[in-house]
């Protein structure tokens, strides 16, 4: 069972929210027009409503560890949408997922799990 989560790791929560702002508000505008979200909420409130986990990698990992669905998943898919990160920012976030977030969730790279042959 694959589970998808929107995450946005950054140096801190304020940086993550600043980088998320344009993409989230563009998405929210459509959702408000369709009656799926109320108007007038703060950016942080909209991120909570959209289940966007953002902040320092340790904060993101802690939020994911508290997710009651993840223990039942066989696959975990991360996405950055509705944010529109640059290629360099997306690469940085992928590196943070692999080196800081995923290990806190119990993931190990293939290189770490391979037993050397004698």
Language model region names:
Residues 1-75, 87, 102-118:
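An alpha-helical appendage that flanks or caps ligand/catalytic pockets
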Residues 78-90:
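Glycine-rich, proline-tolerant flexible connector loops at the mouths of alpha/beta enzymes
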């Amino acid at each position: 069972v694959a589970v998808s989560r929107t995450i946005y790791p950054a140096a801190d929560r304020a940086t993550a929210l600043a980088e998320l702002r344009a993409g989230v508000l563009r998405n929210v505008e459509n959702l408000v027009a369709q009656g799926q979200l109320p108007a007038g909420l703060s950016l942080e409130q909209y991120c909570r409503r959209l289940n966007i986990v953002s902040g320092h990698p340790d904060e993101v990992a802690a939020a994911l560890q508290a997710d009651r669905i993840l223990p039942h998943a066989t696959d975990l898919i991360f996405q950055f949408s509705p944010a529109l990160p640059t290629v360099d920012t997306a690469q940085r976030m992928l590196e943070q997922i692999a080196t800081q977030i995923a290990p806190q969730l119990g993931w190990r790279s293939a290189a770490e799990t391979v037993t050397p042959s004698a």
